[in-house]
Amino acid sequence: PEKLQEIKHEKARIALIGTGSRGQYHIHNLKEIPHAQIVAVCDNYAPNLQQALELCPDAKPYTDYRKLLESKDIDGVIISTPLNWHAPIVLDALAAGKHVFCEKAMARTLDECKAIYDTYNQSDKVLYFCMQRMYDEKYIKGMQMIHSGLIGDVVGLRCHWFRNADWRRPVPSPELERKINWRLYKESSG
């Protein structure tokens, strides 16, 4: 609570870094919030950036998040990039004096998490990591069953999650494989 600050103007000026599927999901939601204004969008993949600009044509486009962070007209950022970019962007955003909302996971390594934690503690900004399943009824019920002892000691777990589509996405040319399908590669997804 002590880190919460009153915004000095009528609307929170938000920038999105990463405008793929999750970034566009956030754009749709932000457009429904009267006290939020999307002022900038950033992506280094031109088709995603173009789609974001179609959704919010008044936003300033960027291809380099560092240039976006230099803007004094941005109060906070939403980070929806591949996981390997979370730590560097969060750290740079806090250093630039921006509030930060970042998609899960926080970072790839404990050292990166510690660096984020330390930097956040030195800032006066709000930092939040999106953990969408944490509040899902099924997960809450499962944790209640574990904590109550209803199912005994948990010694192992096997889980499957079925998506509506394959994780692999089509790529327009082979050199974009790792950029578009980053979730499938250890160096970018953990």
Positions of PLM-derived features:
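Short, Asp-centered acidic motifs that coordinate Mg2+ and/or phosphate
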Residues: 40, 76, 156
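Short hydrophobic/charged patches on amphipathic alpha-helices used for structural packing
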Residues: 65-69, 143
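Conserved SAM-binding strand-loop segment of SAM-dependent methyltransferases
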Residues: 60-64
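Predominantly a Rossmann-like dinucleotide-binding segment in NAD(P)-dependent oxidoreductases
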Residues: 18, 125-128, 133-190
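Glycine-centered tight turns that cap/initiate beta-strands
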Residues: 35, 58, 73, 150-153
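Beta-strand-loop-alpha-helix segment that lines the small-molecule cofactor/substrate pocket
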Residues: 76, 82-83, 87-135, 149
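Short, conserved SAM-binding/catalytic segment
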Residues: 52-59, 115, 119-120
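N-terminal Rossmann-like dinucleotide-binding module
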Residues: 1-56, 136, 146
